[in-house]
Amino acid sequence: MGEEATAVAAAGVRPELVREAEVSLLECKVCFERFGHWQQRRPRNLPCGHVVCLACVAALAHPRTLGLECPFCRRACRACDTSDCLPVLHLLELLGSTLHASPAALSAAPFAPGTLTCYHAFGGWGTLVNPTGLALCPKTGRVVVVHDGKRRVKIFDSGGGGAHQFGEKGDAAHDVKYPLDVAVTNDCHVVVTDAGDCSLKVFDFFGQIKLVVGKQFSLPWGVEITPHNGVLVTDAEAGTLHLLEADFPEGVLRRIERLQAHLCSPRGLAVSWLTGAIAVLEHPCAFGRTGCNNTRVKVFNSTMQLIGQVDSFGLNLLFPSKVTASAVTFDHQGNVIVADTSGPAIVCLGKPEEFPALKPIITHGLSRPVALAFTKENSLLVLDTASHSIKVFKVMEGNGG
């Protein structure tokens, strides 16, 4: 308190006035956190005149209708009817450095991974052409990418060198026409979704075709492997999520099960090996009006119960610029991580039960991120289709995390 009083006196402001302002004016009366300029703590005017922080607006709002009631007078409104409370923001600027940081806010801040820094990149134009999907081999750490080259599947070693490729561009059943995504099974088989003939194709690591699954899909898009070596596939046109079980070495499909229906153009897909949760990235306007780039992340638990969801509008309440999710993954702590092509950026949404929460972890060095994968060493691989490359990010010393 002595240092705080000295700073206040040096600024020419009476300490008792600052303390009164902090308690009466500069504190959200719902969560009791201090207002601030960073997005979650920005003061927001409700239509009734009461002021709460943006994080509380998002928490109070209904996830679909965005309707909420003022916690003080119970007047109904919508989240989009709120606005920045300029008098409180101006008061924050006037008091400036005389305010000290809230210990609760400081302790709550690091809910997500620290800021990541790019320390390596590989691929590039010619080596890769308009890449669309990225996966890691769980046994060898090799990096598998699907792209628009003459041979559609390219495999790099863990350092980005020693590439070999397969999957000829052609019309034969074992060729790959238009790959959208890729995954690698626990026994090192490469699974590719092919929009060209609406099929799922499985290869061994030498490029030998093992299995082709067609007719069951209208437009297979995202693909991911479960901890039990099942294959999850989203069908963007049918709005479904399927689970396939197969004997990959023998090339025998054991069964296929529809886990979810009535999804809105599901594309990206991720599985948490920590909790078994499944994240699906929807594009509600994909087959609707042009110019609409709204996206939605839905997270289901291992029994396919919905445990969290957030869409572009909800994220925009917490972030100053529009967020358009293009890829989703889980980190090793179970946080949901999305690639944002509007930023461009990589953003942590927190754990599903914490939605909506948001923390940018990569804000520089990207052009158009379209796929994400975490290594066992906790580095994050980002497939940047605009630069035709894979960029490797990790927490550097001094960045926290």
Curated annotation (Swiss-Prot):
Domains (record comment): The RING domain is essential for ubiquitin E3 ligase activity.
A molecular function GO annotation: zinc ion binding
Q: Sorted alphabetically, which PANTHER family does this protein's record hold?
A: E3 UBIQUITIN-PROTEIN LIGASE NHLRC1, E3 UBIQUITIN-PROTEIN LIGASE NHLRC1-RELATED
Q: What is this protein's function?
A: E3 ubiquitin-protein ligase. Together with the phosphatase EPM2A/laforin, appears to be involved in the clearance of toxic polyglucosan and protein aggregates via multiple pathways. In complex with EPM2A/laforin and HSP70, suppresses the cellular toxicity of misfolded proteins by promoting their degradation through the ubiquitin-proteasome system (UPS). Ubiquitinates the glycogen-targeting protein phosphatase subunits PPP1R3C/PTG and PPP1R3D in a laforin-dependent manner and targets them for proteasome-dependent degradation, thus decreasing glycogen accumulation.
Gene Ontology CC:
cytosol; endoplasmic reticulum; nucleoplasm; nucleus; perinuclear region of cytoplasm
Q: Where are the NHL repeats?
A: 115-159, 163-206, 207-247, 250-303, 304-352, 353-396
Protein name as it appears in the record: E3 ubiquitin-protein ligase NHLRC1
- Annotated zinc fingers (RING-type), start-end: 28-74
Q: Which SUPFAM superfamilies does the UniProt record give?
A: NHL repeat (SSF101898), RING/U-box (SSF57850)
Tell me the domain of life. Answer: Eukaryota
Record's subcellular location: Endoplasmic reticulum; Nucleus
Catalyzed reactions? S-ubiquitinyl-[E2 ubiquitin-conjugating enzyme]-L-cysteine + [acceptor protein]-L-lysine = [E2 ubiquitin-conjugating enzyme]-L-cysteine + N(6)-ubiquitinyl-[acceptor protein]-L-lysine
